[in-house]
């Protein structure tokens, strides 16, 4: 889908200064603004309040029109704090929705919801901007081919493959490797697909956003020496921001991603952390606007809001946006309207397991809980499907036998079960892999493993050809040839010790 970005920088055009309104009422982040008859702004238009507060400090607040109230009044939601605003202040109708900078100049930079850089690195070197409100691509523009998005991460590509232009839910608590997995995906899409990434921090902790930025600089995903070489643009709307900003920051990130897809014709990864906070912010805004709440107190427009965001994330004939969304499940209740509405849009789920992380198996992706609609013989092929199913069956059998092993020991198992356990332990270790972005911490060089190599490796383990190799040979290696080489090295080392 082609877009026609404007070539003017963000700001208030002199033409629209003729359309001035005045603040009639302020209730927290909500403003009622009166305009002259016949000069009413449209829904989603950006309004700008400029002036000075009582102590002479400059004020510059951007709002978005949400309702037309009648009597020449509109109700708008502020995108920043409304401290210092007073009734009677002048409000400028910009005559257009919020527009944010787009293009290569956004890479390596941090933006707020308005597209303003907040990283103290000066202004963004682009005059190309794009409005955050746009319709989804028309059906005729969509790329309807079902194709796998290869990540180079064995456990993902084999057991829960991502769809090109699909949406993936990332489930995981604190400290199980979510950030490192996100950074590896950003790194791999840049190297293998020539693509870029956009990270939308929606209602996350400021500390987490800062940690992510620092880790990206450390791992080379953001190149401090040459910003243009960076692989990701960051857009943050933190927990302390007003609900209007948290509700729109996802759209700002998506708009930047759409430009890379439609104009640069690239494959783009869009990360949203956390999609639940997007719903939560919408719920707050809905209550502030006086709408009647729906199920569990959520906004009545929940499905519409979620759909308008998710439908824009798709593959077109030009390129693709593949979205990975962290999903917080309130009180672990999957039937809560927020996660339930999100699930309807997901093509795959990647579940991170604390148990695997405790064993030191990274990425700690749970092979049994992670799912994908792409894992079908007609899409991935019989060979891939059969291998994935056998890996899952072996892992499931090992899980069932663990209680017996804990109570009676391994010797009490049948010969067949002992063989299953040995292969399952090799599979578990072979699902781990060294990451490029973790090289600085582990000292092991990262590995990108192609899908064909991944399938071949697991087939060799399942066939019994590698039963004689020690299980530690399969830990943190790339393809199966590295595992056999590691086994030979271990054998040589043990002989030398003797």
Curated annotation (Swiss-Prot):
<keyword id="KW-0813">Transport</keyword>
<dbReference type="GO" id="GO:0042776">
    <property type="term" value="P:proton motive force-driven mitochondrial ATP synthesis"/>
</dbReference>
<keyword id="KW-0934">Plastid</keyword>
<dbReference type="GO" id="GO:0005524">
    <property type="term" value="F:ATP binding"/>
</dbReference>
<keyword id="KW-0375">Hydrogen ion transport</keyword>
<dbReference type="GO" id="GO:0005739">
    <property type="term" value="C:mitochondrion"/>
</dbReference>
<keyword id="KW-1278">Translocase</keyword>
<keyword id="KW-0472">Membrane</keyword>
<keyword id="KW-0793">Thylakoid</keyword>
<dbReference type="GO" id="GO:0045259">
    <property type="term" value="C:proton-transporting ATP synthase complex"/>
</dbReference>
<dbReference type="Pfam" id="PF00006">
    <property type="entry name" value="ATP-synt_ab"/>
</dbReference>
<dbReference type="InterPro" id="IPR000194">
    <property type="entry name" value="ATPase_F1/V1/A1_a/bsu_nucl-bd"/>
</dbReference>
<dbReference type="InterPro" id="IPR055190">
    <property type="entry name" value="ATP-synt_VA_C"/>
</dbReference>
<protein>
    <recommendedName>
        <fullName>ATP synthase subunit beta, chloroplastic</fullName>
        <ecNumber>7.1.2.2</ecNumber>
    </recommendedName>
</protein>
<feature type="binding site">
    <location>
        <begin position="172"/>
        <end position="179"/>
    </location>
    <ligand>
        <name>ATP</name>
    </ligand>
</feature>
<comment type="subunit">
    <text>F-type ATPases have 2 components, CF(1) - the catalytic core - and CF(0) - the membrane proton channel. CF(1) has five subunits: alpha(3), beta(3), gamma(1), delta(1), epsilon(1). CF(0) has four main subunits: a(1), b(1), b'(1) and c(9-12).</text>
</comment>
<keyword id="KW-0150">Chloroplast</keyword>
<dbReference type="GO" id="GO:0016887">
    <property type="term" value="F:ATP hydrolysis activity"/>
</dbReference>
<keyword id="KW-0406">Ion transport</keyword>
<dbReference type="InterPro" id="IPR004100">
    <property type="entry name" value="ATPase_F1/V1/A1_a/bsu_N"/>
</dbReference>
<dbReference type="InterPro" id="IPR027417">
    <property type="entry name" value="P-loop_NTPase"/>
</dbReference>
<dbReference type="Pfam" id="PF02874">
    <property type="entry name" value="ATP-synt_ab_N"/>
</dbReference>
<keyword id="KW-0139">CF(1)</keyword>
<dbReference type="GO" id="GO:0046933">
    <property type="term" value="F:proton-transporting ATP synthase activity, rotational mechanism"/>
</dbReference>
<dbReference type="InterPro" id="IPR005722">
    <property type="entry name" value="ATP_synth_F1_bsu"/>
</dbReference>
<dbReference type="InterPro" id="IPR024034">
    <property type="entry name" value="ATPase_F1/V1_b/a_C"/>
</dbReference>
<dbReference type="InterPro" id="IPR003593">
    <property type="entry name" value="AAA+_ATPase"/>
</dbReference>
<dbReference type="Pfam" id="PF22919">
    <property type="entry name" value="ATP-synt_VA_C"/>
</dbReference>
<comment type="function">
    <text>Produces ATP from ADP in the presence of a proton gradient across the membrane. The catalytic sites are hosted primarily by the beta subunits.</text>
</comment>
<keyword id="KW-0547">Nucleotide-binding</keyword>
<dbReference type="InterPro" id="IPR020003">
    <property type="entry name" value="ATPase_a/bsu_AS"/>
</dbReference>
<dbReference type="GO" id="GO:0009535">
    <property type="term" value="C:chloroplast thylakoid membrane"/>
</dbReference>
<comment type="similarity">
    <text>Belongs to the ATPase alpha/beta chains family.</text>
</comment>
<dbReference type="InterPro" id="IPR036121">
    <property type="entry name" value="ATPase_F1/V1/A1_a/bsu_N_sf"/>
</dbReference>
<keyword id="KW-0067">ATP-binding</keyword>
<dbReference type="InterPro" id="IPR050053">
    <property type="entry name" value="ATPase_alpha/beta_chains"/>
</dbReference>
<keyword id="KW-0066">ATP synthesis</keyword>
